[in-house]
């Protein structure tokens, strides 16, 4: 380990930590980096930046989120911005803060219900946009200004899965609601919808016209991304909280027991293997430079060829 730091002495941070569930905790969001600094946000509302040597660059408090499970929306970085999605029981906001000093670059109020999903970047019609999901809508915001470009009311309930983009469509889903495919634009429209297999937490992923969904009750499904037709389904013994990842022509989905289910990127069900991590896992793996990084409940793993 190169370094570790405690986040303390943040102006405005609550003296007492807010009440959250044990499943979520105070540090559920995944950290983000611009390659020069790393950024983290916590259930206290503290957001902080460190350089690669562990030196604190800046920190601020965004206000304690009114969130009965705990804040879990991860940060994303693009250019000079850190994007923060901050939906709470008292409404929400989406904002961009500067990577160098943490100052607000833009901020927009969101008149919606609470969510636990993360913002997603997508290039649509030659413009970088931020996609968000919440109850009751999927929305797109201009990355440069934060302006809302469009929204579609199509979700409900406690939204944890983020949006996905591929094949010219925006996908959103939530358990006890529905899976939708939206054609984005000034007048967005729902192209198709399906309510058979829906995620509670895991975000869908699309590639080559195939859309993959992992459910909290153990079903993993593949759909035609253009029509919504189901190609296949697969039943695991445990549910999926981690989002599926596509890499090297394969689909990787780790279940809550720590079994990594590896599928061929194909409209026919082809299970390549089911290796065992050895402990429970609910975080989405990261893939880089031929290696897989997995955060288990107790350990951090790096897996690759020697």
Protein language model features and the residues they cover:
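Noncatalytic, solvent-exposed loop/strand surfaces
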Residues: 1-306
């Amino acid at each position: 380990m190169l370094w570790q730091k405690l986040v303390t002495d943040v102006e405005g941070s609550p003296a007492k930590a807010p009440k959250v569930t044990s499943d979520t905790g105070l540090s559920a969001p995944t950290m983000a980096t611009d390659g020069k600094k790393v950024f983290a946000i916590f259930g206290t509302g503290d957001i902080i930046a460190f350089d690669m040597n562990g030196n604190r660059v800046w920190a601020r408090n965004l206000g304690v989120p009114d969130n009965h499970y705990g804040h879990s929306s991860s940060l994303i970085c693009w250019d000079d911005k850190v994007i923060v999605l901050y939906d709470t029981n008292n409404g929400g906001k989406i904002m961009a803060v500067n990577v160098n000093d943490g100052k607000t670059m833009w901020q927009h109020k969101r008149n919606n219900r609470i969510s636990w999903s993360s913002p997603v970047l997508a290039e649509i019609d030659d413009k970088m946009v931020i996609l968000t999901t919440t109850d009751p809508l999927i929305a797109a915001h201009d990355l440069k200004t934060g302006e809302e470009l469009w929204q579609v009311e199509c979700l409900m309930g406690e939204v944890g899965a983020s949006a996905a983009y591929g094949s010219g469509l925006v996908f959103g889903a939530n358990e006890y609601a529905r899976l939708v495919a939206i054609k984005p634009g000034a007048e967005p429209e729902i192209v198709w919808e399906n309510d058979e297999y829906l995620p509670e937490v895991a975000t869908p992923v699309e590639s080559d016209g195939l859309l993959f969904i992992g459910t909290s009750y153990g079903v993993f499904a593949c759909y035609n991304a253009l029509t919504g037709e189901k190609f296949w389904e697969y039943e695991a013994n445990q549910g999926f909280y981690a989002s599926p990842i596509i890499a090297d022509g394969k689909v990787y989905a780790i279940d809550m027991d720590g079994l990594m289910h590896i599928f061929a990127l194909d409209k026919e069900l082809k299970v390549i293997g089911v290796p065992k991590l050895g402990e429970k896992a609910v975080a989405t793996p990261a893939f880089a430079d031929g290696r897989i990084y997995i955060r288990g409940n107790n350990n951090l793993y790096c897996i690759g060829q020697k």
